[in-house]
């Protein structure tokens, strides 16, 4: 079995694709076979993307009171949490955070707002003004994560300077009703398609540890491949008190790493960033995410939880002998 991941990597490098049954089998590997999987994923990443690492950062630009009932989310109005609640911040604060992110080495800066969708009018106008300033004043690539959007909104964001639109599927279609019942999975899929039609790159992934099966993790990866997304953020549940998943069992570091590796083999030439929950779930194996095929990570704080200082991530990358891709505007 130890040669099996290597043979799959060779096949993928030659242009073949990983199918569902192969992916499910890989998630069952243990011991030295799992190490062989990580090595295969790392080889595939190096072949298609090189060894440079992409860093990204976000601002929680509008927080709390979300009408959706996503079971993992601290910002849902359906859950009693201590998440901060505030309206959309001003363009100066957004731009200042973008400058700070660029100074910390981030390649991409995401403007994230709570809620089902951003409102047309002043909210959208303010975000567009901030996007224009970010493009003028920094070399960082701006991204937006504003919920469900229509084509006109997507076009306005792109024309203002947004490079990427972020919108997660969160989990597999077959498991989604266990996570959220206030909107349909197809709305999220259509948002991805709308952003692509408007000429935006799409960053789309999900969160693991919600109670989904390994097979459902593969299911989401295959959906992302079908949607032809450009980059995939992989998050791991950090349970928040007051949410329905506050007492959820954590997945093991090795489960996290195998998931990262299988996503790399399913999506060989796409950017894969490990984001929220990495500190809690990977623990002492955080640096292994790159050995398992990740090509990037989020630095700084997350939406409602604290990340570690960027200097620690820079030191981790230096210790691994990895370089950070530079912003080029």
UniProtKB/Swiss-Prot annotation:
GO molecular function, one term: 4 iron, 4 sulfur cluster binding
Entry-linked SMART domains: BATS, Elp3
Required cofactor(s): [4Fe-4S] cluster; [2Fe-2S] cluster
Catalyzed reactions: (4R,5S)-dethiobiotin + (sulfur carrier)-SH + 2 reduced [2Fe-2S]-[ferredoxin] + 2 S-adenosyl-L-methionine = (sulfur carrier)-H + biotin + 2 5'-deoxyadenosine + 2 L-methionine + 2 oxidized [2Fe-2S]-[ferredoxin]
Enzyme class: transferase
InterPro entries tied to this protein: Aldolase_TIM, BATS_dom, Biotin_synth/BioAB, Biotin_synthase, Elp3/MiaA/NifB-like_rSAM, rSAM
EC number: 2.8.1.6
Listed GO biological process terms: biotin biosynthetic process
Record pathway: Cofactor biosynthesis; biotin biosynthesis; biotin from 7,8-diaminononanoate: step 2/2
Alphabetical UniProt keywords: 2Fe-2S, 4Fe-4S, Biotin biosynthesis, Iron, Iron-sulfur, Metal-binding, S-adenosyl-L-methionine, Transferase
Highest taxon of source: Bacteria
Entry binding sites for [4Fe-4S] cluster: 66, 70, 73
Positions with a binding annotation for [2Fe-2S] cluster: 143, 203
CC cofactor note: Binds 1 [4Fe-4S] cluster. The cluster is coordinated with 3 cysteines and an exchangeable S-adenosyl-L-methionine.
Radical SAM core domain mapped to chain residues: 48-278
Quaternary structure (record): Homodimer.
Protein task: Catalyzes the conversion of dethiobiotin (DTB) to biotin by the insertion of a sulfur atom into dethiobiotin via a radical-based mechanism.
Family according to the record: Belongs to the radical SAM superfamily. Biotin synthase family.
Name listed for the protein in its UniProt record: Biotin synthase
Organism of provenance: Geobacter sulfurreducens (strain ATCC 51573 / DSM 12127 / PCA)
């Amino acid at each position: 079995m130890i040669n099996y991941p290597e043979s799959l990597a060779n096949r993928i490098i030659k242009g073949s694709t990983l199918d569902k049954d192969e992916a499910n089998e890989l998630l069952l590997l243990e011991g030295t076979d799992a190490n062989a999987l990580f090595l295969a994923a790392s080889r595939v990443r190096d072949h298609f993307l090189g060894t440079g690492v992409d860093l990204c950062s976000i601002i929680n630009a509008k927080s709390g009171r979300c009408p959706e009932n996503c079971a993992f989310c601290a910002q849902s109005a359906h859950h009693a949490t201590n998440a901060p609640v505030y309206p959309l911040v001003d363009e100066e604060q957004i731009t200042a955070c973008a400058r700070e992110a660029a100074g910390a080495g981030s390649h991409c800066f995401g403007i994230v707002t709570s809620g089902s969708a951003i409102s047309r009018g002043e909210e959208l106008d303010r975000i567009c003004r901030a996007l224009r300033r970010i493009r003028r004043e920094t070399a960082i690539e701006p991204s937006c994560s504003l919920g469900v959007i229509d084509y006109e909104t997507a076009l306005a964001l792109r024309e203002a300077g947004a490079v990427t639109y972020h919108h997660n599927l969160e989990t597999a279609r077959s498991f989604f009703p266990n996570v959220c019942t206030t909107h349909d999975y197809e709305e999220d899929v259509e948002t991805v398609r709308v952003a692509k039609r408007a000429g935006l790159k799409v960053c789309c992934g999900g969160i693991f540890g919600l109670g989904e099966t390994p097979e459902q993790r593969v299911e989401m990866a295959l959906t992302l491949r079908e949607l032809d997304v450009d980059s995939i953020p992989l998050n791991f549940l950090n349970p928040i008190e007051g949410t329905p998943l506050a007492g959820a069992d954590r997945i093991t570091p090795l489960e996290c790493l195998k998931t990262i590796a299988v996503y790399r083999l399913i999506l060989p030439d796409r950017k894969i960033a490990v984001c929220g929950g990495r500190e809690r779930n990977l623990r002492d194996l955080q640096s292994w995410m790159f050995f398992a095929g990740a090509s990037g990570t989020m630095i700084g704080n997350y939406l409602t939880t604290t990340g570690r200082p960027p200097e620690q991530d820079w030191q981790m990358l230096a210790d691994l002998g990895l370089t950070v891709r530079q912003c080029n505007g």
